[in-house]
UniProtKB/Swiss-Prot annotation:
Main location group: secreted
EC number of this enzyme: 3.4.21.-
GO cellular component: extracellular region
Function: Thrombin-like snake venom serine protease.
Protein name as it appears in the record: Thrombin-like enzyme collinein-2
Cell location: Secreted
One BP term from GO: proteolysis
Organism: Crotalus durissus collilineatus
Length: 29
């Protein structure tokens, strides 16, 4: 999945994935 947040550090990506799994789409925010 190519997200505009790809520029964020790997840590942010992992946090994003964790949040996405929780059901909250914080990545798109």
């Amino acid at each position: 999945t190519a997200l505009p947040q790809l520029r964020l550090p790997a840590t942010s990506r992992i946090l994003c994935a964790g949040v996405l799994e929780g059901g909250i789409d914080t990545c798109n925010r």
